[in-house]
């Protein structure tokens, strides 16, 4: 089983387009994937420092072909809240219709959905990686569209890549240890 963590960032916010139900109106700025060894970033803007990071840089247009190839090889997609956010946006905003195949075949793992089903509570990725691995996100997701508009593409791409690595490491930790840790805001205790 080949697991590929995926994350995307947008140029706009949900309130700019009338809410999360309008996934076709999101403008994707960058998508990152991480398989535990190799990172690939899909972006159409020029990158300065990130291009020298050792990760692969491809155009956003190449993403649909790479995802379709991954699906055909039996690969799974991994992400935090990907069923409600990333997958619909990729399908509806970027016309990446192979996403329908992933959903229909259930070839994806959504860490947010799994934890909600088990605990009845949503845990932000920031909470999970801090409590489980003592790691951190590079920024809040709401900052990414603002930085993108300011032309700070490298920072947004680096943030997106780091999130894929964090989700992958969190998933791997859960696989290896049988649990992940979080702080329950509702109950005021660690889980």
Region spans (language model):
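Acidic, Mg2+-coordinating catalytic module of metal-dependent nucleases/exonucleases
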Residues: 128, 132-190
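Conserved DEDDh/DEDDy metal-dependent 3′-5′ exonuclease domain
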Residues: 40-122
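Acidic active-site catalytic centers that drive phospho-/nucleotidyl reactions
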Residues: 7-9, 110, 163
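Conserved RNase H-like, two-metal-ion catalytic cores of nucleic-acid enzymes
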Residues: 1-69
